[in-house]
Amino acid sequence: MFEEMTEQQAREQILEMTKEYCEKYHNQKKPYKKGDRIPYASRVYDADEMVNLVDSSLEFWLTSGRFTKEFESEFAKYLGVKYCSLVNSGSSANLLAFMALTSPLLKERQILPGDEVITVAAGFPTTVAPVIQYGAVPVFVDVAIPQYNIDPNLLEQAVSEKTKAVMLAHTLGNPFDLKAVKDFCDRHNLWLIEDNCDALGSRYTIDGESRLTGTIGDIGTS
C-alpha cells in the first residue's frame, strides 16, 4: 500500500483515512426518538481529536510531547493565564494543585500535615481527597440549595488559626460566590483553589470584570 510513498505521504493518507473513518462510523448523529436512552455523561470528541490521537501514535509517543506543549500553550492563552500543566484527569489536576501548596518554598504559607482546609460537605470526593492524602484536615461547610455551592455566610464559623486554604468546586457549571469567597480568603490570608473541572467556560463578574472561572483563585483546575 505504501510502496511508492514517502513516510510523510503515508502518514497523510493514514490521517485522511482516519478522519473519514471517524466521520462515517463515530460522528453520525441519529435523531432522538421516544424511549431512547439519554446518557448523563459520555465521551465527547470529533474527527480532529481522533486524527491527533493516531498522529501521535504513529510516532509511538505515548507520554507528553508536541501535542501536550501545543495544548498547554493554547489553553493558557484561552484562560488568560501564564502557566498551564496538562494531566490525565481532573482528579490528578486537583492532586497536583494541592501538592504545589505543600512546597517548603512557600515558607509560612506552606500547607503542612494537620493544617486545615475549608471545603464543602456535599461535593466531589476528588476535591477533598488531596487534602486528606497530604495529611491536612478538611473542614466541611454546608452548601446552599438549589446551586449546591458553598454558603459563604458560614465561612467565618469554619476558620481557625490552623486554616491555610479554601478548596471548592464550581458545582455542575454553576460558579460559587467568588466575590465573597475571594474576599474571605484575602482577609484571612488563605489560599483559594478553584476546582473548575465542572465549569470550564463559565464566567464570573468580579470587581466589574468578567473573567473565566478557574482563573480568579490562586490555583485553578479545569
Language-model features: locations:
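Active-site PLP attachment segment
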Residues: 216-222
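Phosphate-binding glycine-rich loop
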Residues: 66-116, 129-134, 140
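Conserved donor-binding loops in enzymes that form glycosidic bonds
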Residues: 42-43, 171, 222
